[in-house]
Curated annotation (Swiss-Prot):
<feature type="repeat" description="8">
    <location>
        <begin position="189"/>
        <end position="192"/>
    </location>
</feature>
<protein>
    <recommendedName>
        <fullName>Protein B602L</fullName>
    </recommendedName>
</protein>
<keyword id="KW-0426">Late protein</keyword>
<feature type="repeat" description="6">
    <location>
        <begin position="181"/>
        <end position="184"/>
    </location>
</feature>
<feature type="repeat" description="15">
    <location>
        <begin position="217"/>
        <end position="220"/>
    </location>
</feature>
<feature type="repeat" description="10">
    <location>
        <begin position="197"/>
        <end position="200"/>
    </location>
</feature>
<feature type="repeat" description="5">
    <location>
        <begin position="177"/>
        <end position="180"/>
    </location>
</feature>
<feature type="repeat" description="3">
    <location>
        <begin position="169"/>
        <end position="172"/>
    </location>
</feature>
<feature type="repeat" description="7">
    <location>
        <begin position="185"/>
        <end position="188"/>
    </location>
</feature>
<feature type="repeat" description="11">
    <location>
        <begin position="201"/>
        <end position="204"/>
    </location>
</feature>
<comment type="function">
    <text>Plays an essential role in the assembly of the icosahedral capsid of the virus. Allows the assembly of 3 molecules of hexon protein p72 and formation of a thermostable trimer.</text>
</comment>
<keyword id="KW-0677">Repeat</keyword>
<feature type="repeat" description="9">
    <location>
        <begin position="193"/>
        <end position="196"/>
    </location>
</feature>
<feature type="repeat" description="12">
    <location>
        <begin position="205"/>
        <end position="208"/>
    </location>
</feature>
<feature type="repeat" description="14">
    <location>
        <begin position="213"/>
        <end position="216"/>
    </location>
</feature>
<feature type="repeat" description="2">
    <location>
        <begin position="165"/>
        <end position="168"/>
    </location>
</feature>
<keyword id="KW-1035">Host cytoplasm</keyword>
């Protein structure tokens, strides 16, 4: 077979576009232009597991950028119906000052028309400002409901707490708010600032938290001990005071944008550079300060609830075909071109010379990146050199990849629980508004809705108790607990001989059942108070009810 010359083929096609190309020539052209070139056919099979963590990261990165964008856009947005004719922010106060000045400097009061014009402009500015404020408040409320974690509204924060740094972080990061962050102790301040929005934190509290943190944090607290590359969220959210011993170096590095970007790049790659020797000697102290800009603080202050991630994913899954059709119409990419694997060879990983020889032998013939796969270990799909370096790093610090995989598994588990709780509350509201389901509805659903995506999320007992409680979730939960107690008592009584532990369990369960039955009579807006009264040397329980503060 003659050697294939692509330049000659291209020249012939340009000179005579109608020239026919043989199938053999097309096949050779395809082999030359195909980046996934095959070297040999091997009957051996490599078994591996693969999970696309990159895709999950991209989704979170998109979510972070989207949240930052919508909140920033809200700040700059002006409703179309309230765009002011006068755009000066201080115009209202300036007009009032102008009227006072005219009265003081002239003996005559300004003409009525001048005063009316000025007051009309001032009133217009005030009205437009008020309308804009009301519109922004409404939109801000909507955005916070969907994109800012609130323990009273959402099941779980999307933030993964780095509990290896702060002792109290694990217990408080999921249910605290920085608005109440007045404690000057660094451990408490750091843990209460982790999972929340800090827009409304007062200047006094912010300054106190920041100054206290800067004075008490050591360099080890600037980084996640399990993942040194990660800046803890409680550090990112604060305005850090630069320690005196770092001030001169920080000023020199941040004097120009080029200097800042160079320093940030070196910190990211941990490369040695003589001109910033001090920074490289203590990178953990410099890194959070350099990256602690207004933008990073702004982005880290809006932590979305885990509910939003799940709802977004559920929306994609539920509308996948429609989204795919729309995407194919808008963009040129094809959905069926995903991942393709080819195994070139298997060599002894302990013989680094053979590994390098293979790479350098074929690097000019392989247009795509080469990844080395270590058998029996998770493999990161990156370029040959970077993959090997990151592989060694992550296997030496396997807590990092373990945290990623654990979070991936946790996200899959919590999705079903979020959906179940949503359905439970909506069903309770439906029963309150329209009453229980018609008797034949369950038969209809079982016959015609056999492929329902939510089938089985609520048990028959939960639905029955919701109807029994007329949609009152508190009472329905109590009915569930009563059913569980009665079932446990029934199981224990069915046994012929009970052990001492089982007898104690039976007595305990009966007490819990009696207490639960009493709680059914407690109104929703009251709190039951048990009081013990001495009646002829005998203690008797009396029950009082006090008004609950809603």
């Amino acid at each position: 077979m003659a050697e294939f010359n692509i330049d000659e083929l291209l020249k012939n096609v340009l000179e005579n576009p109608s020239t026919e190309i043989s199938e053999e020539t097309l096949k050779q052209l395809y082999q030359r232009t195909n980046p996934y070139k095959q070297f040999k056919n091997d009957s051996r099979v490599a078994f591996c597991s693969f999970t696309n963590l990159r895709e999950q990261y991209i989704r979170r990165l998109i979510m972070t950028s989207f949240i930052g964008y919508v909140f920033k856009a809200l700040q700059e947005w002006m409703p179309s119906y309230s765009k002011p004719t006068h755009t000066t922010k201080t115009l209202l106060s300036e007009l009032i000052t102008l009227v006072d000045t005219l009265k003081q400097e002239t003996n005559d009061v300004p003409s009525e028309s001048v005063v009316n014009t000025i007051l009309s402009i001032a009133d217009s500015c005030k009205t437009q400002t008020q309308k804009s404020k009301e519109a922004k408040t409404t939109i801000d409320s909507f955005l916070r409901e969907h994109f800012v974690f609130d323990p009273n509204l959402h099941a779980q924060s999307a933030y993964t707490c780095a509990d290896t740094n702060v002792d109290t972080c694990a217990s408080t990061c999921a249910d605290t708010n920085i608005d109440s962050c007045t404690d000057t102790n660094e451990d408490t301040c750091a843990s209460t600032c982790a999972d929340t929005n800090i827009d409304s934190c007062t200047d006094t509290n912010e300054d106190t938290c920041a100054s206290t943190c800067a004075s008490t944090c050591t360099s080890t607290e600037y980084a996640d001990l399990a993942d040194p590359e990660r800046i803890p969220l409680h550090i990112m959210q604060k305005t850090l005071n630069v320690p005196n011993e770092l001030q001169a170096d920080i000023d020199a590095i941040t004097q120009t944008p080029q200097g800042y970007r160079a320093a940030a790049h070196i910190l990211q790659n941990i490369e040695l550079h003589q001109s910033i020797k001090h920074m490289l000697e203590n990178p953990r102290a410099f890194k959070p300060i350099l990256f602690n800009t207004k933008i990073t603080r702004y982005l880290s202050q809006h932590i979305p609830p885990q509910d939003t991630f799940y709802k977004w994913n559920y929306y994609i899954e539920d509308n996948y075909e429609e989204l795919r059709a729309a995407t194919e119409s808008i963009y040129p990419e094809k959905p069926d071109l995903e991942f393709a694997f080819i195994i070139y060879d298997v060599v002894d990983s302990s013989n680094q010379q053979k590994v390098d020889e293979f790479y350098y032998k074929y690097k000019d013939q392989i247009f795509s990146e080469v990844s080395s796969i270590q058998l029996g270990n998770w493999t990161l799909l990156g370029s040959f050199k970077a993959n090997r370096e990151r592989y060694n790093y992550f296997n030496q610090n396997n807590e990092i990849i373990k945290r990623i995989l654990d979070r991936h598994e946790e996200d899959l588990k919590i999705g079903k629980e979020i959906l179940r709780n949503t359905i439970y509350h909506k069903k309770a509201k439906n029963i309150q508004e329209t009453g229980p389901d018609a008797p034949g509805l369950s038969i209809y659903n079982s016959t015609f809705h056999t492929d329902s995506g939510i089938k089985g999320l609520l048990s028959f007992k939960e639905l029955k108790n919701l109807e029994k409680a007329s949609g009152n979730i508190k009472k329905a939960r109590e009915y569930d607990f009563i059913d569980d107690c009665e079932e446990k008592i029934k199981q224990l009584l069915s046994k012929e001989n009970l052990t001492s532990d089982e007898e104690r369990e039976l007595i305990k369960t009966k007490k819990q059942l009696n207490n639960a039955l009493e709680m059914l009579n407690v109104p929703d807006d009251t709190i039951r108070v048990d009081m013990w009264v001495n009646n002829n040397n005998k203690l008797e329980k009396e029950i009082l009810y006090t008004k609950a503060e809603l």
